[in-house]
Amino acid sequence: GTCEYFGGDYALSDITMCTFSKSFGSIGGFVAGDAKVIDYIKHMARPLIFSASMPPANIAAVIKALEIIEEEPQRVARLRYNGDLLRQKLQGAGFDTGESETPIIPLVVGDNEKTFMMWKGAFERGLYVNPVISPAVPPHRSLLRISCMATHSEEQIEFAFSVLKEWGGKLGLI
């Protein structure tokens, strides 16, 4: 998270939030903070008021993911390496990847139709990325969200880059 990335102290944070739907491969998340803050959220946050508890299987998945992250720090290092590698390749080819420094890379396409064309073309070549269009992003800032994993090989990163570069050329993005 942000505190870990910047080498900060969680004790200095007023509130800590985490989703379990990305690196933990599950659903749900948590919010931690001062008891007064958490009490306020419990009683005033509409999405929380009507939400259900996480299923036990998903909690077990999160616990196991945490154990792996703690016991195998090389996975986190590899994840960062893979994200940096793909981002540098995309930027070097002329793609707009915004200011993200995470392994989830936004590839800005701009136009909704081109975004879906590139998404479909990548999918047909065996590369899965997520299209994100307005209103989830500002108008004319549609993008593909690319998620790198620690387990991706350099060959897979190169394959992803080649598919995206091919479609970027076809659509006049680069």
Regions inferred by a protein language model and the residue ranges of each:
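Active-site C-terminal subdomain of aminotransferase-like
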Residues: 1-101, 113
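Short alpha-helical scaffold segments that flank and stabilize functional sites
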Residues: 32, 64-68, 86, 118, ...
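Short alpha-helix boundary/capping motifs
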Residues: 57, 69, 118, 149-152, ...
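PLP-dependent enzyme catalytic core of the Aspartate aminotransferase-like
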Residues: 124-127, 136-174
